[in-house]
């Protein structure tokens, strides 16, 4: 029986698809008058590529073709070009690029992840995606691809330990709500997904990171302020971050900031601040400056906490924690000189 060819005459093989896509992206880059035809060819090629990678309702993706396409994407540099030219591609095409990128990133051969290896060797791909937050028309697409990259520890490590990581502090404050929220989702993912890696990163870069982080906690933007406070609570209560928590709660300026945030005009900010404040009070190993601040404000704190968010009548845990803190503060004694 005659073996069916992998690609029929009407279906181009991966090398042809990649070549057509590269050639037409080059036309789009020039921004001359012939872009309509090129744009159409780009759309068709992306569709064909997606069909090879994802299959269709009728058939599974052909393994051999997927391997060929992946190899072509790496060797031709097209994976990089697709990110670089994302702004030139139409709306549906941008969605296709995201799907193709994430699909090829998940691809494994045994225990190997070839695309993770490729991006590790070409880390500028990660920084192009990160810089995408500065371009509103591609920001959310870049965010989706970036979070897919972060699932892989080697790629998360490259971003965390790069100078560009600090750009997140700027992106989460962007004036466009959707983009700022997306940037925060990526930022949070980076700081919570790979626990041991993150603990190591925070310990090595404590001063720099927390200096930037403090600005988020004092942001004029309510959403940024609330999300940052909530994430801070998660970070210092994670057992992997014990050393970071110990350092954070030893510093009097951090306690003062939380005491101010307990009095914020927003009840939600107050509530998130409470969850960080309680760590200072509940710690059995308070530093002397922390004890002194709590003693200096002892009567005021007891009175304040007694009536703090009394409307939360259905939250038993909150009531228990509040009573525990009141007792801890009441029992504080001046140490003999």
Curated annotation (Swiss-Prot):
GO terms for cellular component: cytoplasm; cytosol; serine/threonine protein kinase complex. Found in serum of 50% of patients with acute monocytic leukemia. Component of a trimeric complex composed of STK11/LKB1, STRAD (STRADA or STRADB) and CAB39/MO25 (CAB39/MO25alpha or CAB39L/MO25beta): the complex tethers STK11/LKB1 in the cytoplasm and stimulates its catalytic activity. Belongs to the Mo25 family. Disulfide bonds: none annotated. It comes from the Eukaryota. It comes from Homo sapiens (Human). Component of a complex that binds and activates STK11/LKB1. In the complex, required to stabilize the interaction between CAB39/MO25 (CAB39/MO25alpha or CAB39L/MO25beta) and STK11/LKB1. InterPro entries: ARM-like, ARM-type_fold, Mo25. GO terms for biological process: intracellular signal transduction. GO terms for molecular function: protein serine/threonine kinase activator activity. The gene is CAB39L. This is Calcium-binding protein 39-like. SUPFAM superfamilies: ARM repeat.
